[in-house]
């Protein structure tokens, strides 16, 4: 049996890590099935997608909390194609970006647009290598449109990928992990972008 203090500590842990939101919003109806692996399944692609969705569920509340606490003039859009900005914000966007989907798009004052992409790698392989190159290209396309790019990534899969993570750190303006995002660096970057004169 857990003590009241242990229960409070578990509740705090679930809230701070985003697990509360994750379990409340997950697609399965039974946590026991999820934990025993029935819902998670053996399909690698589905598992990768699920880890990406889990990262969105962890990072989304961090972004919302920053915007609310600092009263930042950002509208937060989740899982939208850039075409959405043309249709709903009357922005001009290059055709190369129109059909690209973003984890998060923040639309700020004076059309300050920030694309935040998140991912988590639990294992090594070709995916971390591919993602670095694709996000370098994404940032370049965004910069051509006057937009900003933030990449939040984490996971043990990066441990054996030092060259790739170094490449990302050198070529991407705002690469973060969850620790830095939670400890104020994401907040600092979002405030800095609003003050940027571009």
Model-identified regions with their sequence ranges:
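Active-site metal-binding core of divalent-cation-utilizing nuclease and nuclease-like domains
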Residues: 76-109
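Short beta-strand-loop-alpha-helix junction that forms the active-site gateway
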Residues: 117-130, 156
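Basic, amphipathic alpha-helical patches used to engage nucleic acids or provide basic targeting signals
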Residues: 125-145
């Amino acid at each position: 049996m857990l003590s009241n203090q242990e229960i409070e500590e578990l509740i705090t842990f679930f809230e701070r890590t985003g697990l509360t939101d994750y379990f409340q919003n997950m697609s399965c109806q039974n946590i026991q099935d999820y934990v025993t692996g029935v819902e998670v399944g053996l399909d690698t692609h589905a598992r990768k997608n699920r880890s990406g969705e889990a990262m969105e569920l962890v990072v989304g509340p961090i972004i919302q909390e920053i915007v609310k606490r600092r009263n930042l003039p950002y509208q937060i859009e989740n899982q939208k194609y850039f075409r959405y900005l043309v249709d709903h914000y009357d922005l001009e966007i290059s055709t190369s970006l129109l059909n690209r989907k973003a984890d998060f798009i923040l639309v700020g004052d004076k059309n300050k647009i920030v694309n935040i992409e998140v991912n988590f790698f639990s294992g090594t392989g070709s995916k971390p290598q591919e993602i670095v190159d694709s996000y370098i290209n994404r940032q370049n396309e965004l910069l051509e449109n006057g937009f900003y790019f933030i990449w939040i990534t984490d996971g043990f899969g990066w441990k054996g990928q030092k060259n790739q993570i170094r490449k990302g750190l050198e070529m991407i303006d705002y690469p973060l992990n969850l620790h830095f995002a939670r400890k104020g660096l994401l907040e600092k970057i979002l405030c800095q972008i609003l003050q940027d004169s571009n």
